[in-house]
Regions:
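Mg2+-dependent phosphoryl-transfer enzymes with acidic/Ser/Thr/Gly-rich catalytic loops
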Residues: 15, 191-270
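Conserved acidic, metal-coordinating active-site core of Asp-based
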Residues: 130, 134-220, 228-229
Length: 270
């Protein structure tokens, strides 16, 4: 299969053997200046719940803390618990690139991530002292982000501060949308999360809009080599990286169109 429509048809054909995975920021939620004010677009929560009841696996894989995802993507606390519990296990909420997941309605961090907690705490404290005025420091528990969206002219200064702290703390630095992120040097990414969750599925879709989503595209490429039908959906924006848009099998314009696409995947009896 080559076209996006054909791959969508493969997902719809047998939901019991298919999985749908998505990024959060820029995909299910619009990009905003203050990350704490980000919320999913209208319809996103309901469509995820409907898909989770129909498909073998549905997930949101994000750089956000898993607790944030649980708070804002659960239809309500009890429904979120039901959809993420060990018995059902269909709705995967993976935060911090897989360093945290929601299990039985509770956030659980990996042992490896917990060992890096003190290092991150010290790094966050130093960065808050050293970051130039206009660059905000967001501690996420097991990662820390320097945001310069409101002052793009400070990008070089923010990079220098992030690089210095990464070297000092043995953390890995990644570049995001008008931000730099430091996280533990662990072999965990959106790609590893998707690869593990989708290993036994016959059709898999991932939707994303940023550099961090490319590892999930890589995972889908590996699954395709193993015989799975895969669909890489890129979400267009002024800040979406060219590589992601070039590799996408299907392109949509923003979170509202993402929800429309996801709604089209709900079975008629869903």
């Amino acid at each position: 299969m080559s076209s996006g429509e054909e791959r969508l048809a493969a997902l719809r054909a047998d939901p019991s053997r298919a999985g749908i995975f998505s990024d959060f920021d820029g995909t299910l939620a619009p990009i905003v200046d203050d990350p704490e004010q980000s919320r999913p677009v209208e319809g996103a929560v309901d469509v995820l719940a409907a898909l989770a009841r129909a498909y073998a696996r549905v997930g949101v894989v994000s750089g956000r803390p898993a607790g944030f995802l649980l708070e804002h993507l659960g239809p309500d606390p009890e429904a979120a618990r039901d959809l993420t519990d060990a018995e059902h296990g269909k709705l995967l909420l993976a935060g911090l690139y897989g360093l945290e997941v929601v299990q039985d309605g509770e956030v659980v961090a990996t042992d490896e991530a917990r060992r890096w907690g003190p290092v991150l705490d010290e790094a966050i404290a130093r960065l808050k002292e050293e970051a130039p005025e206009g660059v905000s420091v967001e501690g996420k528990g097991f990662t820390v982000v320097l945001h310069f969206r409101r002052h793009p002219e400070l990008a070089d200064e923010a990079r220098a501060v992030a690089e210095r702290e990464a070297e000092r703390s043995d953390l890995e630095m990644g570049e995001g949308r008008q931000s730099f992120e430091l996280r533990p040097p662990l072999p965990t990414s959106k790609g590893t999360v998707v690869a593990d969750a989708a290993a036994r599925l016959s059709a898999v879709c991932f939707l994303g809009d940023d550099h961090g989503d490319l590892t999930a595209f890589d995972a889908l490429d590996d699954l395709a080599e193993s015989g799975a039908t895969t669909l890489r959906v890129g979400v267009r924006s002024e800040e979406a990286p060219d590589e992601l848009l070039d590799r996408a099998d299907l392109l949509v314009d923003g979170p509202t169109e993402v929800v429309q696409l996801l709604r089209s995947l709900i079975p008629d009896d869903g």
